[in-house]
């Protein structure tokens, strides 16, 4: 017998039937589940007199990709893309996402949700929507989980005159009965022959930056920065070899807040040898609360609101991009040499795959999912291969137009010896990270396919062959890729290129190639030698 609760006279399911996606057998089941989840969430909102509850795509560290424990927005909306914010009021459910996911979101969201196409002229931003919503009320109470909300967005909402924020409740956690556990996988050491620079040398550079900015403490909250600084890697996020942790750096101390069960004796000894104080993962909040009369450097765009909220007003918060973010974006000579090796290894795997595909399509059964698995098989032949750098995007014919498409059993196309298949994939090697997209003709193609392929190829070649002046940013170069399309009244609704981490996130700020200038000027940097951009 299923557990049931009643909200406004309606029975709602609360057991694993509505919380475990493995139990979902059809699109109809998903719709019913999402509706039940919204009823349950609104019931929790009523208990705290909330007019609105915001569920961003976020973990405790502002990560782009995250572990299953943190997929609250997916749980409450059914949308599985990597970017988006769900907003739930007493009578509305809305989801904002960017142009990469318009097609996917329209397909996955149940009718009860309204898709808000982020960046479109007639679509308000989340902040604008919240402000307009609040202005219609004398007093507006807005809730969210402060540990899973960026400080920058939360502080903007907080400044709306008639808004009261309630950030201490994880309401999704209240209704997610079979929520996956917080990941706690083994942490491992990245040898200096791959990292190119020791922790000791990196921390010296960090402290020099701290002295220049006249700060007493640096709080590192992003997982990629934590891993990069320590020359450690982990397995807490699929396809991103990082681990859950925070770092606090002062002029004389470095403290790592981490789940101790993730530390082997070897890693613990490594940390001790480097004079790194090991503290419990969740102690960061109490320790931050106890700081007094210090200048603290923090990146409010990635640090969670709960951390910045706990910082006493006796302190001064210096809010800027972390020095580690800028440092790791510019690869050292060892990293560059290794990355070249990684791309050779990846090129070999891709060549073997394309050869196999061309020689076997139409002869043996294959589909979108099996193509991704086959490419993974060829990558796995390299001794230094670690894992995919993201879930492979294999889109046959019209599926190739869905920017971050992920094949499922329900959508999985059979591959035939005609048309085109787009494959966007990458790998993590000890020598670095790759990201490669290829569109492959499998036989007869239409004139339209041929035209689109040619225009995209022209843009790709123009950008790849670009010679540009020192001081250029990605915004200045973006037109080279788009011009052949623009000349024909066409475009693509997403960025052109992005930074790539070294055995870290395949999407690495701040360097990128896009036509939009971002509000945060630190994310519109000058391109520098050593920045690897895909």
Regions found by a protein language model. Give the residues of each.
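Active-site neighborhoods and metal-handling regions in enzymes and metal-associated proteins
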Residues: 2-534
């Amino acid at each position: 017998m299923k557990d049931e609760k009643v909200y406004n006279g309606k029975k709602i399911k609360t057991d694993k039937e509505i919380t475990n996606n493995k139990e979902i057998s059809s699109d109809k089941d998903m719709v019913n589940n999402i509706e039940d989840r919204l009823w349950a969430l609104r019931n929790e909102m009523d208990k705290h007199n909330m007019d609105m509850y915001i569920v961003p795509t976020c973990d405790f560290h502002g990560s782009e990709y995250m572990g299953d424990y943190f997929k609250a927005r997916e749980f409450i909306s059914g949308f599985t893309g990597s970017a988006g914010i769900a907003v739930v009021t007493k009578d509305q459910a809305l989801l904002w996402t960017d142009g990469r996911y318009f097609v996917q979101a329209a397909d996955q969201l149940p009718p009860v949700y309204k898709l808000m196409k982020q960046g479109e002229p007639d679509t308000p931003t989340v902040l604008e929507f919240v402000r307009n919503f609040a202005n219609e009320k004398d007093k507006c109470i807005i809730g969210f989980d402060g540990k899973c909300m960026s400080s920058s967005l939360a502080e903007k909402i907080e400044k709306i005159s008639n808004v009261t924020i309630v950030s201490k409740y994880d309401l999704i956690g209240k209704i997610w009965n079979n929520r996956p556990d917080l990941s706690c996988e083994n942490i491992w050491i990245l040898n200096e022959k791959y990292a190119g620079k020791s922790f000791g040398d990196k921390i010296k550079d960090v402290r020099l930056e701290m002295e220049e900015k006249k700060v007493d403490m640096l709080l590192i909250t992003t997982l990629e920065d934590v891993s990069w600084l320590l020359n450690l890697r982990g397995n807490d996020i699929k396809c991103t070899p990082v681990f859950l942790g925070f770092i606090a750096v002062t002029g004389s101390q470095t403290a790592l807040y981490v789940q101790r069960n993730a530390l082997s004796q070897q890693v613990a000894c490594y940390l001790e040898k480097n004079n790194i104080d090991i503290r419990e993962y969740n102690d960061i909040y109490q320790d931050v609360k106890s700081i007094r009369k210090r200048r603290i450097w923090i990146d409010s765009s990635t640090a969670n609101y709960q951390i910045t909220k706990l910082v006493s007003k006796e302190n001064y918060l210096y809010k800027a991009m972390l020095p580690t973010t800028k440092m790791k974006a510019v690869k050292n000579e060892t990293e560059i040499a290794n990355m070249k090796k990684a791309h050779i290894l990846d090129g070999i795997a891709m060549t073997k795959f394309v050869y196999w595909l061309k020689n076997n399509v139409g002869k043996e059964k294959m589909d979108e999912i099996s193509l991704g698995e086959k490419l993974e098989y060829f990558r796995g032949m390299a001794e230094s291969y670690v894992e995919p750098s993201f879930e492979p995007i294999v889109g046959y014919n019209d599926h190739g137009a869905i920017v971050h498409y992920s094949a499922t059993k329900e959508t999985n196309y059979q591959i035939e010896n005609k048309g085109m298949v787009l494959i966007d994939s990458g790998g993590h090697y000890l020598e670095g990270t790759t990201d490669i997209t290829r569109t492959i003709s499998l036989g007869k193609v239409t004139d339209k396919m041929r035209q689109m392929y040619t225009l995209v190829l022209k843009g790709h070649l123009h950008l790849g062959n670009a010679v540009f002046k020192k001081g250029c940013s990605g915004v200045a170069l973006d037109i080279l890729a788009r011009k052949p399309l623009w000349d024909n009244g066409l475009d693509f609704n997403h960025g052109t290129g992005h930074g790539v981490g070294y055995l870290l996130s395949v999407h690495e700020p701040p360097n990128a190639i896009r036509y939009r200038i971002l509000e945060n000027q630190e994310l519109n940097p000058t391109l520098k030698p050593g920045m690897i951009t895909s």
